[in-house]
């Protein structure tokens, strides 16, 4: 059963990467008209993916705990849409980026869920997608590079706080969690 679940997850991830590549191509070539059929929603959910297929805020899929986490994440009040600017930051990604507090809450919600699907959603969002979030914090200095991003930061307490981008990763290494 574990091998089947792993194979399904791998297939879903390959499909997701292919669709993201197609969406990036469409956007870069002026074909970024968003169609509902372009949505990829994680199986068993209505809110976990790019957009949602829910009929309303109370409409959840069969993975109710996981879906509730995604719904709350989708409703984050502090976000920067693709191509937009806020807090002196410009989101150059092709998707919305959120305040780190929303991503941290999402991570903890998925981690505390007893459903199997929550682990796959958490792995996809926090490990595979390589997204970023923002927060008002003292400037960061990267003291150790990982494979794809900085793996250890230090805060420069001598400088004033400012809004800045942070890597969202599986270890969720945000400044307030560092020593």
Curated annotation (Swiss-Prot):
Q: Which residues form the propeptide?
A: 22-39
Q: Which residues bear sugar attachments? A: 112
Keywords per UniProt = Calcium, Disulfide bond, Glycoprotein, Hydrolase, Lipid degradation, Lipid metabolism, Metal-binding, Secreted, Signal
Q: Where in the cell is it found?
A: Secreted
Tell me the cofactor note.
Answer: Binds 1 Ca(2+) ion.
Question: Cell inner membrane: is it a keyword of this entry?
Answer: no
Chain residues that bind Ca(2+): 47, 49, 51, 74
Spell out the reaction equation it catalyses.
Answer: a 1,2-diacyl-sn-glycero-3-phosphocholine + H2O = a 1-acyl-sn-glycero-3-phosphocholine + a fatty acid + H(+)
Q: Name one GO cellular component term.
A: extracellular region
Q: Where is the signal peptide?
A: 1-21
* Catalytic-site annotation from UniProt: 73, 103
Kindly give the SMART domains that the UniProt entry links to this protein.
PA2c (SM00085)
The yes or no answer to whether the keyword Glycoprotein is present is yes
| SUPFAM superfamilies recorded | Phospholipase A2, PLA2
Report disulfide bridges, numbered on this chain.
Answer: 48-70, 69-109, 76-102, 100-133, 142-150
Tissue expression per record: Expressed by the venom gland.
What does the record give as EC number?
A: 3.1.1.4
* InterPro entries listed in its UniProt record: PLipase_A2_dom, PLipase_A2_dom_sf, PLipase_A2_His_AS
> PANTHER family, per this entry?
RH14732P (PTHR12253)
Q: What does this protein do?
A: PLA2 catalyzes the calcium-dependent hydrolysis of the 2-acyl groups in 3-sn-phosphoglycerides.
Q: Which family, according to the similarity comment?
A: Belongs to the phospholipase A2 family. Group III subfamily.
Protein name per Swiss-Prot or TrEMBL: Phospholipase A2
Q: Which organism is it from?
A: Xylocopa appendiculata circumvolans (Japanese carpenter bee)
